[in-house]
Amino acid sequence: MQYTAAQSQSVAIIGASGYVGVELTRLVQQHPALSLLGCYVSEHSSDAGSLLSDLHPQYAHLVKLSLQGLSSQKKELIKSSADTVFLCTDHGVSVELAPEFLAAGLKVIDLSGGFRLNATEDYPSFYGFEHQQDSWLQQAVYGLAEWYPQEIAAAQLVAVPGCYPTAALMALLPVKQAGLLSCNKIIINAVSGVTGAGRKAALTSHGAELSLQAYGLFEHRHTPEIAQQLQHEVLFTPHLAQFPRGILATVYAELNDDVSDADLDKAYQCYADQPLVRFEKQARPAIKNVVQQPFVDIGWHRQGNQLIAFSAIDNLLKGAASQAIQCVNLQLGLALEEGLL
C-alpha cells in the first residue's frame, strides 16, 4: 500500500542495541509507512559503530544497520530530519532527551518509565532519580493503545506502558470500567522471561543462577503505574523465570455482589473489535502462543464473587515495541495492526 506524505513518517530509534530496541528496529523496517533515519546509542557506548546484526544475528536478514553514537551533530540531524523519535533508553536518560526533541517539534514515543507516572514525587522512591520535567510529565499520554486511542493520536509525547502493567491492565480494565469490582485490593502475580531484565549481564539473570523467583516485593516500579491506571489498590508481585521472553499475569479480584458471567461477558466485549486482542472466556492463556506475536491473550474464570483473570503477552512486543508501533499507527490515522500482522 502507498501512503501519502501525511501518513508517512521518518523515525529515529535511540537505544537501539537492547532487546526492545532491536525488535522496534525490525518492526520499523517492515512497516510500510515508516522510514528509518537511523539507530543510535549513547555516544560513548561500546556498541557504537557496531552492526546491529552483529549484536542480534538472528535478524541479520532484516536489519543491516550500523549503531551510531548520539553526538550533538546526530541530535541536530534527528531534529531536522525526523518526525518521530523512539526512546528505548534508561528512564533518566529519556527524561533528559525527550524535552530536547519535543522542543524541536518532534513527536516522542518513550518506551522507558520516564513519563509513565503522574507525580514527580513518585520518581525518587520508584525510579531512583528526581524528575525535573513536571510540565512534560503532565502532558504525556499513557500509550495503552486499545484504551486511549484518541488521546494517543493527538499526543506529542507518549509514554508506552511497562510490560507488566500492559498485561495486568488489559485483563482488568474491562471489569473496572464496567463497575464490577469491589473496593478490596486486587492481587496480581506475573511471571516474565529473562529478557525483561535487559541485555546487561547480571548475576540475578545469569542462566546458571536463574530458576523461578519473586522479586521487587511491595516496591516494584510497576505497582504505582498499575494502581494509577486502575484507580484501585493493588498488590503486585513480579517473578523472573528461566525462559527467554513472554509474560503471564494472573490477577485475583473480588467482584461486587450479584455479578454474573453475563456481566463479565458484556464487560470483555469491549475487545470484540480489537484485532490484537484474543479473548476467550474459559481460556487459560499460554506464553508459547504469544511469543514473537503482537497479541494479548486474555481469559477469565469466576466462582461466586471471585474473579481470576489471565493475560499473556510477549514482553518485548505488546509489552514494548509493537505497542509503540500501535501508538504511531494511531497518530498516523492507520489501523492499529498496520505493520504488525
Curated annotation (Swiss-Prot):
Q: Which SUPFAM superfamilies match?
A: Glyceraldehyde-3-phosphate dehydrogenase-like, C-terminal domain, NAD(P)-binding Rossmann-fold domains
* One GO BP annotation of this record: L-arginine biosynthetic process
What EC number(s) has UniProt assigned to this enzyme? Answer: 1.2.1.38
Keyword NADP among record annotations = yes
Q: Please tell me which top-level EC class this enzyme sits in.
A: oxidoreductase
Give the subcellular location. Cytoplasm
Pathway listed for it is: Amino-acid biosynthesis; L-arginine biosynthesis; N(2)-acetyl-L-ornithine from L-glutamate: step 3/4
Where the protein is mainly located, per its record? cytoplasm
Q: NADP: present as a keyword of the record?
A: yes
Q: Which UniProt keywords apply?
A: Amino-acid biosynthesis, Arginine biosynthesis, Cytoplasm, NADP, Oxidoreductase
- Molecular-function annotations in GO: N-acetyl-gamma-glutamyl-phosphate reductase activity; NAD binding; NADP+ binding
By its UniProt entry, which SMART domains does this protein fall under? Semialdhyde_dh
Q: Which HAMAP family match?
A: ArgC_type1
Query: What's the name of the protein?
Result: N-acetyl-gamma-glutamyl-phosphate reductase
> What's the source species for this entry?
Idiomarina loihiensis (strain ATCC BAA-735 / DSM 15497 / L2-TR)
Its lineage opens with:
Bacteria, Pseudomonadati, Pseudomonadota, Gammaproteobacteria, Alteromonadales
Task: Give the encoding gene's name.
Answer: argC
